[in-house]
């Protein structure tokens, strides 16, 4: 059984159909990719998977559970999905450690701190938890965003053009690093990109 299953989904804005009859299956632990030019509906598909947009037709299942149909939407907070955006979306007033631990506020301080330290090491930023986002480079900020998304151990990770704000050299290096991090975390993920090189560097 697929971990993520999109079955003949349609997505529309008003009367305008932006995605028609899309089907996709992704096995647990694999990294998939939606590759295409800007404006073709890739990000809209991610928003539908995350629970922010309603289907016009079809069905989405996550780990066997129906999470979206035209008449049913499981709320985003109950889907256990992590997201990484192209603009990092870090909280500027919080330290790196507090950004990463933001989704772990229900855990005890000891559990939260241990998880944050584990993730800082995983993304190659051990010992830098007290810094603030403005003190980090673009590549480091994107790693912090990835660590924050991975912190609650999501069932699925969605990456929406995560390297588009980085220069070409850093983008190429970070794409391989991100793949290694996702694999080390044993996480299922989908990358959205318009860049063929990124697609082949990150996805299975």
Task: Report residues per predicted region.
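The feature captures the beta-strand-to-loop junction immediately N-terminal to the Walker
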Residues: 35-37
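Conserved ABC ATPase "signature" region
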Residues: 65-68, 110-128, 179-186
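ABC ATPase NBD coupling module
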Residues: 66-82, 106-114
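Short coil-to-helix segment of the ABC ATPase nucleotide-binding domain corresponding to the Q-loop/switch region
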Residues: 94-101
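Conserved signature/switch motifs of ABC ATPase nucleotide-binding domains
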Residues: 131-134, 152
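Hydrophobic anchor residue at the start of the ABC signature
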Residues: 146
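Catalytic Walker B motif of ABC-type/P-loop ATPase nucleotide-binding domains
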Residues: 157-161
């Amino acid at each position: 059984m697929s971990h993520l299953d999109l079955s003949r989904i349609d997505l529309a804005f008003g009367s305008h159909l932006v995605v028609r009859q899309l089907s996709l299956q992704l096995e647990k632990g694999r990294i998939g990719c939606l590759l295409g030019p800007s404006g073709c509906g890739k990000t809209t598909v991610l928003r539908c998977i995350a629970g922010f947009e309603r289907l016009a037709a079809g069905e989405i299942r996550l780990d066997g559970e129906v999470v979206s149909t035209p008449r049913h939407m499981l709320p985003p907070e109950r889907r256990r999905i992590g997201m990484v955006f192209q603009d990092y979306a870090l909280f500027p007033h919080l330290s790196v450690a507090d950004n990463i631990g933001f989704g772990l506020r229900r855990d005890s301080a000891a559990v939260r701190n241990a998880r944050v330290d584990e993730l800082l090491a995983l993304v190659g930023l051990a010992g830098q938890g007290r810094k603030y986002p403005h003190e980090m480079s673009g590549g480091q900020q994107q790693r912090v965003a990835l660590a924050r998304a991975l912190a609650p151990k999501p069932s699925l990770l969605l990456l929406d053009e995560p390297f588009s704000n980085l220069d070409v050299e850093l983008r190429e290096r970070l794409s391989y690093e991100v793949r290694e991090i996702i694999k080390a975390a044993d996480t299922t993920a989908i990358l959205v990109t318009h860049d063929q090189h990124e697609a082949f560097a990150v996805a299975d």
